[in-house]
Amino acid sequence: MSEVLNKVSDCVDAVFVLSVASFTQRIEHVKKQFQDHGIAFNFVFDYDPPEIDQQLLDDVFAESSMRLPHKSLVLKHIKAWQVAREQSYKRILIFEDDVFLCRDFTQKLCAGVPHIDKLDEGYLVYLGGSDTKVTDSFFLSDDVLVPQPIATTEGYITDLTAINKRLDWLDTNKVTLPADHLVRSIDSLIDIRQYWFREPLVEQGSVFGYFDTELDSSRSKHGRLYNVLRYRWNRFQRRKLRRWLVRMKLLLGMKID
């Protein structure tokens, strides 16, 4: 008889939220949201920008155009992986602090875990992507999990095998990329398979305008209304409209990307 999954804690060994101690609005947002969903979690406040010493930066990062806030976020992801390794957690869930969970997040996550359980060890499952470009084949899949490189890192599940491989890679390589590009790059180099939930479980508040962005200069130069409207348009045309167009291409016998 299969195990009944009712809570997020039934699905993963630990939940980490990466934040900065001075980001009070985001912290209160996370606390309320996760309380509403009944999710136990731990904040990662290690490596806030003012606390990072130069020696650590020199040890971890190579020369690049990355700003200190980007480096801080990379270090926070690494910290969560290190804790998972130290505690021998088999599977963890990592969020960034601008995450918004879908209304039925727990139900959808619990429904997806049996599919995650069938994956070979060494994986990452991305929970977002509602406004991100995907291939035509993404819309033709009937699977709950679709193989695809991640877009961003606001929410993902990963297992201990993948974590150990990433940390081993970092032992002998320096970082030149922000967190999302770094995870995508490392995983492709060390044979960690990445998947998306076909229907996203989370959104990113700094993308759709709820929070001011701290990292993305392309969004920070625009006003909140512009970012809200751009997000809604991208979500419509990259998901709903694309799904319809792919189905039309299939019916007409056109080439599918």
Placement of each model-derived feature along the sequence:
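An acidic/histidine-cluster motif and surrounding catalytic segment
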Residues: 2-95, 99-257
